Every structure is written in C-alpha cells, then in structure tokens.
Amino acid sequence: MNEIDFSPITTFIFDFDGVMTDGTVFCDFEGHPLRATNVKDGYALQLASKLGYHVAVISGAVCPSTIVRMNSLGVTDVFTGIPDKVLKLNEYMQENGLKPEEIIFMGDDIPDLHVMQCVGLPACPADAVPEVKAISKFVSECPGGKGAVRDVIERVLKVQDKWMTAEAYAW
C-alpha cells in the first residue's frame, strides 16, 4: 500500500456495526439489541471531538444505544437508520462546508461501498469484506471493535502533531 497522506483530514465518519463493534449483536430477554464497543476507540473518538475535528456516525441500523454511547464521547453527529449513506454524507458535507478530500469514512461491508467512494480517504478495519478492502486507501491492522477506530484517528493526529498534546491527558 502506498504512503497515505493524512494531513488534509478534518473529518472522521464511521459506520457503526463492524467498525466500532466486532459485528456481534446480542439481544436482551426482550429482544433489544446490545453491542459492545472498545474503550480505546472511545478515547480516540472523544479526543478527536475535543480537538475540534468533525466526528460522525452514519449507520443503516437503528439502535438507540449507539446514539447514547457516541453522545457520551462528545460525538453528536450520529445518524442511524440511514438507508442512503451517500445522501446523508452529501447533506453533512454541505451543512459543514466540507470537501471530500478532508474526510475519512471507515466502513466494513457492502452497504458502505458507495459512500466510501465519495470521500478522499476510504478506510476499513482488518476484517472488512474483500470488496471494501479493495477500495480502501487505508486498511487498519486492527479488526472492527478492536481498535480500528483508534488506529485511524491516532495516525491522523500524529501526522498533524495533535496526538500527545495537553488535551490528550484528560478524558
């Protein structure tokens, strides 16, 4: 894989299931879905948000706990139940004055393909499906739900000299 230029990135957008989770969905005794997320991913998400990056989730799934978890990390741009991720991306770009080259979108499966082709830096976890890996400019060494989100955020912040700043020491 060629050297990746993370310097223009101002925006991180993620799918949720399979990126921030390992893709496993548990159900409680009433049938409500439960998903596990990674604390190290959470640390990186809250730091990026605190440092002023745009951080968003665009997910096809409807899961109220996704919104609660992301909001607890300072991520307020959480869009769930989105059937057309490209349309939502275009709306988000227009509302925030963003250009494709500023954006990383990390996805893991077929529903993410089209939206990933609309950003400057398509990315995926190590365990993404082959079709997603084929179009990704960055493939994390970490699988979904096991540090892939942290990996990509950390790489961007390091390139932009924002990784070990004073803000990094407080959560």
Residue ranges and their predicted role:
Residues 34, 71-72, 77-78, 86-171:
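Mg2+-dependent phosphoryl-transfer enzymes with acidic/Ser/Thr/Gly-rich catalytic loops
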Residues 2-84:
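Alpha-helical substrate-recognition element adjacent to the catalytic core
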Residues 1-2, 162:
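N-terminal charge/polar-biased segments
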